[in-house]
Amino acid sequence: MKLYQWQIFRWFFETLNCSLGRAYKASKRIQYIKKDYSFYKNTILFSKGSWQAINLYTNTELRNTLFIIYWSLLEYRISLCFLNLLRKIESIQFKKLSVISFILNLHSSLSHVNKQLQILSKVLFDRFYFYLWKNMYFSLLLHNSLSRFVKESIEESEQSGFNNENKKDFQDETYFVLNESLEKDFSRIREMNRKLAWIEVTLNDLNTWKSYYLFFPFLSEMKNTPQNESSFKLKNFEITTPAYDSTGFIPRSISRTLSRFQIELMGQSSSLVLQEFRSAKYQALASIQYIGCLIFLPWIISRSLKEWFLEPWIKFWWDTYQSQISLNSFQEERASEGLQEVEEPLWLDKLVSNFLKNQSQDLNIEIYGETIQLIRMYNENSIQTILHLLTGMICFTTLGALFILGKKRLSVLNSWIQESFYSLSDTMKAFAILLLTDLCIGFHSPHGWEVVIGSSLEHLGFAHNKHIISCFVSTFPVILDTVSKYWIFRHLNRISPSIVATYHTMNE
């Protein structure tokens, strides 16, 4: 085997070991995640929203760990396939590139090496037999050819004279190098088999654990009666608890104070602080990631589709199959007004300069050139209007898909926003509510709504209709005002009456 081929072979073998070691470490992390979850479940009292955050945090950590395991095993499998391919290529040229042939040619002056060559052939066969363990038929053929080749080489070597000193040096050098390398490889192979068995057992145990234990604490307390077993199915179970603490007859502050007092008596305050920190960290990271997806992902998808697919296709379709340059009468009116604005100054300049009789042909050429430029400009505006309409539809479709597919993330975001809002002081809460309501439904908000609606209509290629804009401005802010007042009266007044009092004081 050539040196570079052996180096490639060793590199793939090291890749096998590294990828399997990475998967093994990730499987060890699964055990720690399960222990942490069991510890929090048995020692800490949570609300329903906190339990859902813990479950989502545990599921996220498990998904990340499983991704590392499966990716490492895929890398392991690919490296193993390349090793098999290299072994097949090497087996074709085995006689030409045999290590035994290289050694015999190098030590052609040695004699009486029958025993040493037998040891060498056995060691080499053991190595190649392991590398070709999946192809037993090919391994037998390889062993027969190797034995036959070694036997012929021994018979040829016995015909020449060798001394005992060279014989002993060759035996010691060959046996030491090959024996040390093989023992190291075999130890690695045994270690890899042990790691594969551990990973398989861990994954099977994880599936069982997720099916029976990764739910809210009240599920583990259900009795294993036949009635409960028939009526409760873990596979069809869905978590429907809200992401925040619902208000009831007893205020949340009292229930939280009692829970914390009980935890202090049990001596578990340190674990509570650690768990609350992890839960808050997960909620913040998950909420920020989801907000980033809601903001940037629709824009990136629509922008990419517009640049790579929509814009070239729409330009080709519009310029080839459409004879008109405008989409509706509003754009036609704007095009005619633009043409009049171009023609009138030109005619006026020529009349004032008294060159109308002598240069009427030049005037027509200038008007024709300006008209062509206007046609190109409004043709491009029509194409851009179609693109804006399609990209807007893509953005709304992407947002809808994110809302539908990310219900759990949305519930965590809702819980995080409410917790952040409730952690503010009463003055800051009232200020935030007052600022938001004044921006949307305040005294100066109708003019802002008119600008927003008019710009949106022009962006989509529609006419600036004052009646539609006035109707929208007169109804939509009123609906927002009604919803905000109902929320303040129904929800905020029950949670914190001091916020409502501060809000009314600041509003007056």
Swiss-Prot record:
One of its GO terms (molecular function) is proton transmembrane transporter activity. It is a multi-pass membrane protein. Signal peptide: none annotated. It catalyses: K(+)(in) + H(+)(out) = K(+)(out) + H(+)(in). Its main location: plastid. GO terms for biological process: potassium ion transport. Contributes to K(+)/H(+) antiport activity by supporting proton efflux to control proton extrusion and homeostasis in chloroplasts in a light-dependent manner to modulate photosynthesis. Prevents excessive induction of non-photochemical quenching (NPQ) under continuous-light conditions. Indirectly promotes efficient inorganic carbon uptake into chloroplasts. GO terms for cellular component: chloroplast inner membrane. The gene is cemA. InterPro entries: CemA. The chain crosses the membrane at residues 66-86, 282-302, 386-406, 433-453, 468-488. Belongs to the CemA family. Keywords: Antiport, Chloroplast, Hydrogen ion transport, Ion transport, Membrane, Plastid, Plastid inner membrane, Potassium, Potassium transport, Transmembrane, Transmembrane helix, Transport. It comes from the Eukaryota. It is found in: Plastid, Chloroplast inner membrane. This is Potassium/proton antiporter CemA. The keyword Transmembrane helix applies.
